[in-house]
């Protein structure tokens, strides 16, 4: 939003402009009574395409509603030279000359007054309002969630024929047609569409497309995809537009040959991140990628690297953003740890097998343990001012809301190409506290103690999706397990969705593991 104000509002501020603006806020934005809500639901459709969504805006000069996403309100502004419009969801004023939402003290005062009037007509409970809602009103005020009146409750009871969201509801479960070796894409789409915060973002129509051609925007297509998944339809969806856009924006994935699901995940997040730039709310980002787009809010964490000089023990620290954590496995050519007694390793038909039990926690311990860099990798120490041997240790500086663990099952080198089939046991609930940089610093200072419940909870995760690969490096197939509601699991094999048990999930090989934070704090 432009902080300096806008001179173009003067053309609107003519006789009775405040009254006209009040009518728009009362009838089509804040809607404080059942009558105005009915009027808004009936009247607020795009006058060009008839859509209810797509960020409807109302012209301030005439009676016209148009889609912001599809640029219909832009066409009206250009043809009629009506340069101001109001966002019917949040109440912000947009200037087509400035190409930005603008601030005007007088207009904001009208908006606040009409919003307060609307509150008085509703049952308002501050406890029901989340800080997230507080940041999205557009005028810096809170608003309440809908509370049905006694009459509305009676109407709901007398009209039972409606779709109910229950614990056994299958809304959100939908197969995907394999378009020719596209199982790598289908399994990632299943994981993303069942990521709770990502689902809430797209189903609330929060994306603000700023691309010249929305048809080339991957975020717009993902928004459509979420609408398809949660529409209640059960027939398999054909993701041909998604595949086309992926090929367009990630050329290395184009073609019908087999691709890697992990590579697709990172490419998809990268393109979504780039196409989400218009969704940044302008607030200071609280993640290492310094971006407030929905992708970085959910998936970005901070990895701390501490390099310690072996002579002066000086520490050089860097923090890098990450979207996933790639973990080495026993049986790879990368040194891991001595095999436990009774374990054995071998290679059969190009696949590496290791007997014995390895856990996800073991892999994380290995990932965060100090590593001696050796004489061939000396670095210049800022304390000694000379090249010295050092040790390097990785820890988690900031955890993402969704943590994705990539088990490195495919090994490619000049001499070797193989798949590692080592079984890795992974839990339904994961505590990342031992792998935090703060835990390491406490131990080094001799102050380590059992973390408090609140700190402990901040680092707790629950499993919600697993991607698996069956077959060999040369020929294989991807499937996924996804969690629906609290404890229902389903196996997604392209177009086929079947119910699965928790045992099925935990006994699977595991290639990509998706965990969601159990407790979230609004920032």
Curated annotation (Swiss-Prot):
Disulfide bonds: none
Organism (species): Xenopus laevis
Complex formation: Component of some SAGA transcription coactivator-HAT complexes.
Gene Ontology BP, a term: chromatin organization
Enzyme Commission no: 3.4.19.12
Keyword Acyltransferase: no
Protein name, UniProt field: Ubiquitin carboxyl-terminal hydrolase 22-A
Family, per entry: Belongs to the peptidase C19 family. UBP8 subfamily.
Chain residues that bind Zn(2+) 2: 46, 49, 67, 72
């Amino acid at each position: 939003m432009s902080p300096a104000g806008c001179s173009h509002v003067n053309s609107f501020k003519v006789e009775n402009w405040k009254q006209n603006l009040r009518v728009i806020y009362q009838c089509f934005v804040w809607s404080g009574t059942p009558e105005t809500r009915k009027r808004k639901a009936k009247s607020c459709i795009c006058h060009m395409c008839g859509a209810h969504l797509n960020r409807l805006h109302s012209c301030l000069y005439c009676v016209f509603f148009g889609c912001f996403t599809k640029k219909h309100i832009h066409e009206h502004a250009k043809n009629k030279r009506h340069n101001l419009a109001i966002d019917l969801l949040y109440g912000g004023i947009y200037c087509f000359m400035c190409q930005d939402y603008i601030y005007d003290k007088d207009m904001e005062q009208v908006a606040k007054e009409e919003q307060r009037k609307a509150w008085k007509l509703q049952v308002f409970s501050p406890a029901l309002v989340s800080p997230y809602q507080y940041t999205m009103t557009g005028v810096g005020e809170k608003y309440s969630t809908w509370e049905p009146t006694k009459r509305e409750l009676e109407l709901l009871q007398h009209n039972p024929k409606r779709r109910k969201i229950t614990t056994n509801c299958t809304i959100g479960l939908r197969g995907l047609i394999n378009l020719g070796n596209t199982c790598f894409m289908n399994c990632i789409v299943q994981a993303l569409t069942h990521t709770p915060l990502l689902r809430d973002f797209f189903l609330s129509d929060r994306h603000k497309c700023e691309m010249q051609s929305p048809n080339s925007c991957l975020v717009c297509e993902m928004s459509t995809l979420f609408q398809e998944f949660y529409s209640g339809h059960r027939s398999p969806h054909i993701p041909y537009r998604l595949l086309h856009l992926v090929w367009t924006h990630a050329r290395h994935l184009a073609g019908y040959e087999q691709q890697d699901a992990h590579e697709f995940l990172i490419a998809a997040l990268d393109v979504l991140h780039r196409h989400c730039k218009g969704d940044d709310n302008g607030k200071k980002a609280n993640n290492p990628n310094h971006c407030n787009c929905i992708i970085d809010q959910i998936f970005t964490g901070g990895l701390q690297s501490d390099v310690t000089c072996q002579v002066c023990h000086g520490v050089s620290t860097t923090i890098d953003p990450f979207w996933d954590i790639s973990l080495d496995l026993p049986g790879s050519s990368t040194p891991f740890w001595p095999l436990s007694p009774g374990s054995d390793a071998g290679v059969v038909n190009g696949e590496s097998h290791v007997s014995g039990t390895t856990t996800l926690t073991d892999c994380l311990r290995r990932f965060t343990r100090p590593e001696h860099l050796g004489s061939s990798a000396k670095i210049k120490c800022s304390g000694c001012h000379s090249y010295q041997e050092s040790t390097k240790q990785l820890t988690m500086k900031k955890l993402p809301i969704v943590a994705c663990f990539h088990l490195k099952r495919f090994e490619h080198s000049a001499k070797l190409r193989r798949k590692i089939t080592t079984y890795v046991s992974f839990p339904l609930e994961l505590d990342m506290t031992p792998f935090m940089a703060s835990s390491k610093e406490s131990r080094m200072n001799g102050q380590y103690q059992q973390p408090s419940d609140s700190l402990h909870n901040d680092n707790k995760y629950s499993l919600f999706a697993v991607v698996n690969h069956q077959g060999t490096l040369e020929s294989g197939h991807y499937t996924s397990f996804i969690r629906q509601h609290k404890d229902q699991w389903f196996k997604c094999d392209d177009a086929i969705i079947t119910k699965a048990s928790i045992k099925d999930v935990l006994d699977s090989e595991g290639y990509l593991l998706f965990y969601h934070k159990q407790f979230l704090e609004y920032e």
